[in-house]
């Protein structure tokens, strides 16, 4: 048994496998009457698609076919929305050697331990990053709904190996700092889909050189994505197990390769004194706001009104072109394995819109499920 569903009010189910005829998603709880900009959604999906020499050579035309829940003009009807994408460019022969020999770093062994030989592992099966395409369909719609309510989400690659990008201006929650943050977010949101998701152009050039080198070495690399949302009202969320951090984390860990997440000052809070970590308050334009944002916009599982921000770490792509030690699950004998197929050098660049999507779905679900009871937010 398993589930690939997320959400309380806005529920998202992802279906299909890497080499199945189709993949897709079903979304429940979307507001009736909202008009989705289908061109904007298509542009958003292009950010996830491979377009660089270090990306997988597997090309799929990710033009979603909407089965229900939305009109040809993009108007939501309030009923479950289902979208499908065909898988046309598959090569199952690349996975003959790994049918009984689990690939190190992949979910092959853990899936076999759960489902035995019924698990379809070609292309990574249901665990494949190919499934982030329907995630981005759902997330792209959620991003538009949030934006209509004044909430904006943006992300960039903060670190890849030893190359660091300029971080968002986030600890300081002053008016001046928020203006700079808005400029940084706008730079990313206005970039063309094929542009690398960095704030510093020099970081992009260094990354190009690194990934070109790693491809020639048949190796891979991970990285860190930094993501932020502005315009989130204070008072949404709830304590304990359905808190904002819990919900966002659950969604973000649904992005393949994500292995860690931290909010605000994160692990560094262990190095701070209380007088350094506490975010003081002031009245600004009639509202109470934190003057700093070590908390990452969340306290007690509930939003503070400051930008919500986190960083997540992605492991290197597990499929490498080097010989690795594994075992044959049938003979129970050792085997050396060289993974075949078409793979990326890194997941971190193409994962940026995927992380934004997961974040958007978590925020939208929280906004509708656990609104501020003081400000009157509710699901219309």
From Swiss-Prot:
Source taxon at top rank: Bacteria
Query: Which residues are noted in the entry as NADP(+)-binding?
Result: 48
Q: Which GO terms describe its cellular component?
A: cytosol
Q: Does the keyword Amino-acid biosynthesis apply?
A: yes
Q: Which UniProt keywords apply?
A: Amino-acid biosynthesis, Aromatic amino acid biosynthesis, FAD, Flavoprotein, FMN, Lyase, NADP
What's the EC number here? Answer: 4.2.3.5
The entry's FMN-binding residues are 126-128, 300, 315-319, 342
Q: Which cofactor does it need?
A: FMNH2
Q: Name one GO biological process term.
A: chorismate biosynthetic process
Q: Catalysed reaction per UniProt? A: 5-O-(1-carboxyvinyl)-3-phosphoshikimate = chorismate + phosphate
Query: Which family is this protein grouped under?
Result: Belongs to the chorismate synthase family.
* Protein name per its UniProtKB record: Chorismate synthase
Organism ancestry: Bacteria, Bacillati, Actinomycetota, Coriobacteriia, Coriobacteriales
């Amino acid at each position: 048994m398993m589930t690939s569903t997320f959400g309380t009010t806005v529920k998202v189910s992802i279906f299909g496998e890497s080499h199945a005829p189709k993949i897709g998603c079903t979304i429940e709880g979307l507001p009736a009457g909202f008009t989705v900009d289908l061109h904007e959604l298509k542009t958003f999906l292009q950010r996830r698609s491979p377009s660089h020499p270090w990306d997988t050579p597997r090309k799929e035309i990710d033009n979603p076919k909407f089965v229900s829940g939305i009109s040809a003009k993009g108007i939501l009807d309030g009923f479950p929305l289902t979208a499908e994408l065909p898988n046309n460019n598959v090569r199952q022969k690349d996975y003959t050697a790994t049918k009984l020999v689990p690939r190190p770093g992949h979910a092959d062994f853990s899936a076999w331990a759960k489902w035995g030989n019924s698990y379809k592992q070609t292309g990574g099966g249901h665990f494949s990053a190919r499934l982030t395409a329907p995630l981005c369909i759902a997330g792209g719609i959620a991003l538009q709904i949030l934006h209509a309510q004044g909430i904006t989400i943006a992300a960039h690659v903060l670190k890849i190996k030893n190359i660091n990008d300029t971080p968002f201006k986030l600890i300081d929650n002053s008016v001046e700092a928020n203006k700079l943050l808005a400029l940084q977010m706008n730079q990313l949101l206005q970039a063309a889909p094929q542009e690398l998701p960095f704030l510093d152009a020099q970081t992009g050039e260094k990354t190009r050189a690194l990934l070109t080198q790693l491809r020639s070495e048949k190796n891979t690399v991970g990285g860190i994505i930094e993501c932020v949302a502005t315009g989130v009202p204070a008072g949404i969320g709830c304590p304990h197990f359905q808190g904002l951090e819990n919900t966002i984390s659950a969604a973000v860990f649904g992005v393949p390769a994500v292995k860690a997440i931290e909010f605000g000052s994160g692990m560094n809070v262990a190095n701070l004194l209380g007088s350094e970590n506490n975010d003081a308050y002031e009245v600004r334009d009639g509202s109470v706001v934190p003057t700093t944002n070590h908390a990452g916009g969340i306290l007690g599982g509930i939003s503070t009104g400051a930008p919500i921000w986190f960083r997540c770490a992605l492991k290197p792509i597990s499929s490498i072109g080097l010989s690795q030690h594994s075992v044959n699950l049938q003979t129970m004998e050792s085997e050396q394995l060289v993974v075949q197929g078409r793979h990326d050098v890194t997941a971190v660049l193409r994962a940026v819109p995927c992380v934004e999507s997961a974040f958007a779905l978590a925020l939208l679900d929280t906004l509708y499920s656990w609104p501020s009871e003081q400000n009157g937010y509710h699901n219309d």
